[in-house]
Amino acid sequence: MRFNQYSYINFPKENVLSELKKCGFDLQNTANHKDSLETFLRRFFFTYQDTNYPLSILAADKKTDLLTFFQSEDELTADIFYTVAFQLLGFSYLVDFEDSDVFRKETGFPIIYGDLIENLYQLLNTRTKKGNTLIDQLVSDGLIPEDNDYHYFNGKSLATFSNQDVIREVVYVESRVDTDQKGLSDLVKVSIIRPRFDGKIPAIMTASPYHQGTNDKASDKALYKMEGELKVKLPHKIELEKPQLNLVQPQGQAELIAEAEEKLTHINSSYTLNDYFLPRGFANLYVSGVGTKDSTGFMTNGDYQQIEAYKNVIDWLNGRCRAFTDHTRQRQVKADWSNGKVATTGLSYLGTMSNGLATTGVDGLEVIIAEAGISSWYNYYRENGLVTSPGGYPGEDFDSLAELTYSRNLLAGDYIRGNEAHQADLEKVKAQLDRKTGDYNQFWHDRNYLLNAHKVKAEVVFTHGSQDWNVKPLHVYQMFHALPTHIHKHLFFHNGAHVYMNNWQSIDFRESINALLTKKLLGQETDFQLPTVIWQDNTAPQTWLSLDNFGGQENCKTFSLGQEEQAIQNQYPDKDFERYGKTYQAFNTELYQGKANQITINLPVTKDLHLNGRAQLNLRIKSSTNKGLLSAQLLEFGQKKYLQPYPAILSARTIDNGRYHMLENLCELPFRPEAQRVVTKGYLNLQNRSDLLLVEDITADEWMDVQFELQPTIYKLKEGDTLRLVLYTTDFEITIRDNTDYHLTVDLAQSMLTLPC
């Protein structure tokens, strides 16, 4: 384990003493260090009647147990302090470590022995081996009462609200959109779990079209075959209009009553970060949105009608929209328990909705935590003039996602009444998708949140993985740079795939978000501020560093690609083409081994490099015909240890999100040997070589100069490493699978790779 502590806040000494005293640690500034440590430990072991026993089973050094040490005349030393501290954090002395000073350096332990009271205070705020901070572990065990009131420690809310005796209710928010054109505003179901409290509380809201269930069968039927010819497009400039949103006004009167009438029973799934905040005094709201089970309207996937309906939930929390008790719209209930302050959470589609909501500038949205969220839907299902699929989901497109998330069809009555209209709407969507050309058009323009990024007022926290080929890193990169300069923005850029990171051992992500939301939503005045970029070092396990920016580097390193011309044959023998189509993983393996139709260029790294931003290929290239698809991947090549993209379980159900509440696994990205690691990749239709909005002719056998930016990333390379650039045509996981007989030729002498560093 390595310690990477970003959540700790330096408080004045009087605050430290006061907070310790409130938790029963009655330490005196004038006492000697040894006496203070003993006083601290006897309170620490509050679950024991006889505190001599837990002291006797800890060690001060290799010869002395802690009780014997306190009964001796020996002085407290730094070595003894560290030895005790590591044991309190769950490490076994003489098993996990033998020399505390060596272990302190190996783990990056954040505490430097000096002022003992401040050391102990920071120790309580430090994560244990099993994933909780020490103070959270003690509170979970009953250190302070579960009194349904707020208690703070180091600028973070503690788990002092009951997660058993909570209010569980359902309301139906009246949106300002009418997606199915029935003349009534769409209703959106809101599932609420909130702690009991006499005052007003903030809300954690997760906007998830998946929450009420998904129609997997209908979605699977809507998948496309990726086999087909790359279309030759007529040259033209793509014209666009400013997206429009038509809103509807509230209709009719509704009796105001005191409480919701529908009780929330089981929910499909909760998000463990939300679970963590519930006993800390934050309401949990789950909203599936228009076109989902128990709501009304069509599934408009990603457009501002969908976003508006989610926004209206925040409006209701602030008294600007109504919520009915049921679908009759006869009775309404106010969110009189809400303080109006909201944070959004969730990954993938959920993080996408956070991005979209932020761009409305809605009052009350204080923080978004957008994890692996889409910023422009074109870049999810298309790339540079190509029809593409999200990584791992070949054949998926917007209409199959619509079928997946239109969960109203899971209710037989809704299916009978509404499926015909839903299918008619879906046909319109299919026509607008334009799978023939892969070009950007008005449909995608209406789902581009970057256009409204200037409206963002909330503080923004992103998480994204360098190995996320589902929602690719371009999404967070573009959103990060599109935000207004005065906005506080933060990015946790890890080396995983499309995954959550709130239960990783190496980073205090939950505690950092607690500090932020306690400040922004509960009004605690602290100096807490996350760094702009928190990056997971790819060269070592469990190592995180603070950076000033994502991209924007002034320096670069250029690699020449060779001296000769090389060709890429597009067509495969039928047997190989069929085999790769059935198992794209086999294609990826053989591509990395140099066995596919490709140009492979190994580039020695002659000095340490820290890639930060978008690698760019400048290529002199020609096609043997009037079309061309170019794929590129940049690998770090060579057998060595690399961080793996998916977290592994270190210990099962050891993270406590409250008081024995929603226990979850402690995880981490493994660090183990592999033959290579993908650094970045990209795909380009050569007819869109100059600009996404410009379609140009390709003249057979005529040289073209192409600038091709790959996916943004942050990646460290050391002298002696090897980069491998792979250029090819069809990618059997991502692109259309065109097996026509043509080839691309690259003049390597007139081509180069540039890395921002």
From Swiss-Prot:
It catalyses: Hydrolyzes Xaa-Pro-|- bonds to release unblocked, N-terminal dipeptides from substrates including Ala-Pro-|-p-nitroanilide and (sequentially) Tyr-Pro-|-Phe-Pro-|-Gly-Pro-|-Ile. It is found in: Cytoplasm. One of its GO terms (molecular function) is serine-type peptidase activity. Pfam families: Peptidase_S15, PepX_C, PepX_N. Coiled coil: none annotated. The keyword Repeat does not apply. InterPro entries: AB_hydrolase_fold, Galactose-bd-like_sf, Pept_S15_Xpro, PepX_N_dom, PepX_N_dom_sf, Xaa-Pro-like_dom, Xaa-Pro_dipept_C, Xaa-Pro_dipeptidyl-ppase/CocE. GO terms for biological process: proteolysis. Its EC number is 3.4.14.11. It comes from the Bacteria. The keyword Cytoplasm applies. Removes N-terminal dipeptides sequentially from polypeptides having unsubstituted N-termini provided that the penultimate residue is proline. This is Xaa-Pro dipeptidyl-peptidase. It comes from Streptococcus pneumoniae (strain Hungary19A-6). The gene is pepX.
